[in-house]
């Protein structure tokens, strides 16, 4: 039996040394020290020994089991350390390598134009006013000199929710609400950026949803010359310092007189090209002097106060500024289109 124990010890130590991972090592542990292992069988056979031999053989079995256990623990520590070192090597970071570039987003071209226009007018002393996109018919039409049944309402089909509630068709209601809050006391000097909605068929130049920026100035002694000077400054900041503007008579129910505003073509310098369709001028916005009826409905004395208003579409400004030929590009989230403005 002593020879058998020494043989088991030698076999176990050899297999422990040969184990190359923790699973193989655990298999050796179970094979030699488990309940069905050979050392347990030796212990069960000690009943056939004489009383004098039992203590000697028991001590020998314990020595063999202790030797195998110590070898197992030492090998386990070695394998665990090797596994940690292997994992660390796989996860090692060379801090001298250049970093991986992080792809960053960029402002949408419409956001760029809107913020540029806002900054321009804020620098001229204007404040930004906002209002609801779901608007009352009164502020969208009636407070702007468009009573129910007025033929000018046919100029823009609207998204009505109820007879008195609709999606605003322009940002002019913000002007009406702001003047109302001033309770007939000037000055008022605001721009109103925001989304508007009209029942247009989407194509290269039309959309059922788009953005507008409208401006309003109300105070004593406001003249058409103030409007022209303001818009000339706007055109030169947006399209170049050598730009000029011209007014063409037009009609809007909420201004009188009303004008369409053209800017001299920034592509050809006014000589005529495909951008300006050979005219040398490009239409960019509508404007006019605030109609006395609009002032009176907002609580202002039209004999004391005058004002001017203007409205533009950032989409059109952006299309002209960046040479974009289809308004739908702004709303399709095509990364090939949007990524071009990283360089702008």
From Swiss-Prot:
GO cellular component, one term: cytoplasm
Entry EC number(s): 6.1.1.20
Major localization class: cytoplasm
Matches recorded under PROSITE patterns: AA_TRNA_LIGASE_II
Catalytic activity: tRNA(Phe) + L-phenylalanine + ATP = L-phenylalanyl-tRNA(Phe) + AMP + diphosphate + H(+)
Free-text remark on how the cofactor is bound: Binds 2 magnesium ions per tetramer.
Subunit structure: Tetramer of two alpha and two beta subunits.
The protein, known as: Phenylalanine--tRNA ligase alpha subunit
Source organism per UniProt: Anoxybacillus flavithermus (strain DSM 21510 / WK1)
Biological classification of the source: Bacteria, Bacillati, Bacillota, Bacilli, Bacillales
């Amino acid at each position: 039996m002593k020879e058998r124990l020494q043989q088991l010890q030698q076999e176990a130590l050899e297999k422990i040394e040969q184990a190359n991972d923790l699973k193989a090592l655990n298999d050796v542990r179970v094979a030699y020290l488990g309940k069905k292992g050979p050392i347990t069988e030796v212990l069960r056979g000690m009943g056939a020994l004489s009383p004098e031999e039992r203590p000697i053989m028991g001590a020998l079995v314990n020595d063999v089991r202790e030797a195998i256990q110590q070898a197992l623990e030492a090998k386990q520590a070695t394998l665990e350390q090797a596994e940690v070192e292997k994992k660390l090597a796989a996860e090692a970071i060379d801090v001298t390598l250049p970093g991986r570039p992080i792809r960053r987003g960029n402002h949408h071209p419409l956001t760029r134009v809107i913020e540029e226009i806002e900054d321009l007018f804020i620098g001229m002393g204007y404040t930004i006013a906002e209002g609801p996109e779901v608007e009352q018919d009164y502020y969208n039409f009636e407070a702007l000199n468009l009573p129910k049944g007025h033929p000018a309402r046919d100029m823009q089909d609207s998204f009505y929710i109820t007879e008195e509630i609709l999606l605003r068709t322009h940002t002019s209601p913000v002007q009406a609400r702001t003047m109302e809050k001033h309770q007939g006391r000037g000055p008022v000097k605001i721009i109103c950026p925001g989304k508007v909605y009209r029942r247009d068929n989407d194509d290269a130049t039309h959309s059922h949803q788009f953005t507008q920026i409208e401006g309003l100035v109300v105070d004593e002694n406001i003249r058409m010359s103030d409007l022209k000077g303001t818009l000339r400054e706007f055109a030169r900041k947006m399209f170049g310092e050598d730009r000029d503007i011209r007014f063409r008579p037009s009609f809007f129910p909420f201004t009188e007189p009303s004008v369409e505003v053209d800017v001299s073509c920034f592509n050809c310098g006014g000589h005529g090209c495909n951008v300006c369709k050979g005219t040398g001028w490009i239409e960019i916005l509508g404007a006019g002097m605030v109609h006395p009826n609009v002032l009176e409905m907002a609580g202002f004395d039209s004999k004391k106060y005058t004002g001017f208003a203007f409205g533009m579409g950032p989409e059109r400004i952006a299309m002209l500024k960046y040479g974009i030929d289809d308004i739908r590009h702004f709303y399709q989230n095509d990364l090939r289109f949007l990524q071009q403005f990283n360089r702008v």
